[in-house]
Amino acid sequence: MKPIRYTQEMVDEFLKDGYWTRELFYDFWERNARELGDQEALVDSKYRVTWAEAKKLVDAIAYTWVQMDIPQSSRIIIQSPNSVYGFLARIAAERAGLISLTVYPYLRERELTYMVEKTEAVAVVILNEYRNFNYLEMYRDLQKKFPHLEKIFLFDDEVPQGAPEGTYSLTQLAKAAAEKPIDEDALKARRLDPIGNIALLTTTSGTTGIPKLVEWPTAPRICTSKGRVDIWGLTNKDTTMAIAPHAGGAAGTLTYFAAPIAGAKTVMLEEFDPEAALALIEKEKATAIGVVPTHLVRMLEVDASKYDLSSLRFIRSAGGYLSPQIAEEAETAFGANITSDLGTQDMGSVSGCRVEDSKDLRRRTVGRMLPGNKVRLLDKDTNEPVADGEPGVLYFRGPHAPAGYYRDEELTSTVFDPKGWTTTGDIVKFDQECLWILGRAKDMIIRGGQNIYPAEIEGLLNDHPKVASVAVVGYPDREMGERTCAYVISKGGQAFSFEEMVEFLKGKKLAMYKLPERLEVVAEFPAVGDSGKVNKETLKKEIAAKVERGE
């Protein structure tokens, strides 16, 4: 199946400049098996697998799927918690010439109905049960709706009685096939083109609750992963750890995509518990962990001094806003730098901080542009380039971007222009060669003709000792057009007044017109889907309704 967006000119450019290669992710697993064969590759609570063993199991799974006559480029859905076999299934799909879609364990029939139908998936890989939910029953029901979903592979060692026809134990199939010769020619015949074939699908978070699907060949993903290996300084001496689900970017970018390129080991925490996470870091001497901000908050509630975390080198936090205050507390408690970066599933990776960058750069910026990315800063209203040093809407193009939305050329064309330029919608400025995020173009507040960037106010308020998190939004006003409201979650439920907020911001020398004119102290923020990102559209509607009611 061919990608829908790349032109021959783009392909030639990225190949000529060395950003795209003819490599697949499997090639790095094969190299690691050859050069680091006895070194551990994957670890969970049940299995410890070396690179040599991992390659053998991957080949066995892939060859089994080929022998089952699953057609090349068929779609296969992998829904698993963090596990060794979850990783093996993902790379085996690529090896067998299949297109994998790895999804979060918490997705249920509503979301999966869309995905199974949209992808015409022929197989799924799941646990029978997990966290008191029966996945096999759910997919049995989906099979009744979609006859093309012919096969179910279980991570369990046994197939339960009464399972639908076409249900297999993946672990037993893999172990049996690993004892027999593999037809290498049959697998080579299924090799995907790293540029010309879709290899994997990813999901986006959205306000509708139904994720969109994004298609990727391996070339841009490998390009980004090599960039991450460089800025994180990953080597085959590192031990990465998935605390967040490997299906998402927070942990998946670090552990599934980047670690094998470096030859680094990956340890998996199957189910999050703050004590268990810290204990596993100590036990496995993890050097890098992938988390979402909520994980850090909960880990800070534990006495970290009970654990030896001296091995930890850096923390990759993504998938939601991490306040500077929480970042400071986490770095102090865990003794590791927290990195920041910019990217989306829809548009690809833009930039990133190096682990050794100063605290100010890691807190306040999203780092330098990744190799090969080109950037333009345009005026929000005129679309003309802004003067050097001035803020503008970020537009970029480069070798890190996906092919587009799966089987949706029309939607893809609304995000990428014919030459590959796209925008995250962020208003940014360049300083010290780094991107400083000032806010989203759609979130910028225009008060009496003056621009107010929410991120600037949020960054200042997050330094207040009573503030745990803050979101700044605009609301309609007849006189000024818009005014500013600060939504605040106070630390420990402390009282926090409007007067305290204003005095604090005045002390920070904030211009008078930027001072919020309303304060709403709340217990939590609405989120965009399951991403953990603050849904500012909901907050805007809420405050606009309050103002209209005269509250």
Language model region names:
Residues 107-117, 124-126, 289, 398, ...:
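AMP-binding/adenylate-forming catalytic core of the ANL superfamily
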Residues 154-155, 510-533:
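AMP-binding/adenylate-forming catalytic domain of the ANL superfamily
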Residues 21, 47, 62-112, 117, ...:
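Conserved AMP-binding/adenylate-forming
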Residues 37, 153, 168-203, 210, ...:
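Conserved pre-ATP/AMP-binding loop-to-beta segment of ANL
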Residues 50-53, 190-191, 199-223:
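Conserved AMP-binding A3 loop
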Residues 172, 261, 286-291, 300-361, ...:
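Gly/Ser/Thr-rich phosphate-binding loop
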Residues 68, 98-172, 492-494:
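Structural core segment of the AMP-binding/adenylate-forming
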Residues 222-239, 247-288, 302:
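Conserved AMP-binding/adenylation subdomain of ANL enzymes
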